[in-house]
């Protein structure tokens, strides 16, 4: 479990707000007691609290990757290309379970790697796939990636919302974090309870209307959604939904398929460079 925080403001130089970023990040120490990191430029501030699981030296965050590539100009009967140079910066909480498959695809397309952490694989997958990266991920995650050339922030949350991600707007600043208490460290963000959110908390809690919280003007990025924030504003889009399909396997095929999926899931989730353990509950016989 790690923690991420950050904010974007196109009308102010946020590099002056380092102490604000540090205060926000310090509220998440329980999520990442091993290490912290900061990335601050004119319009972007990113921070990370790390719980080390994989690649202690190679997985430091926020992680920066420089990229130069040529992009074909999307115009009929044109052979022109745009030379694109940018720094991509990621702050990420989670674990990607299909890193081997992603890494193989990236290496086949000319990417090289400095370590074996999933952070680097995720960041380079975004550089390769763009916003469609979420369609290629198997895992639990909440992450933010800054494109310095576009001056654009991309955020995404996993399919079922295992990893949390909250956001708000305050005085031209877009502010986000793994926990709401970090957002409250940003000057001017008020702790005003939302009557509908409180009603849901006592009436149907812990269930709630997706995207809402118990505080006014503080929202969660919904599961299976990504968000893009740039000078034009905030755009949020759903990238996946659970489909109901006819079940065509017989009993024995179903048992074999379920056993395979269960073992595959466990194997993928037991990747670690530090000692690990698990809690078991009843239900499987």
For the regions a protein language model found, what residue spans apply to each?
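Cysteine-centered catalytic environments shared across enzyme families
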Residues: 1-285
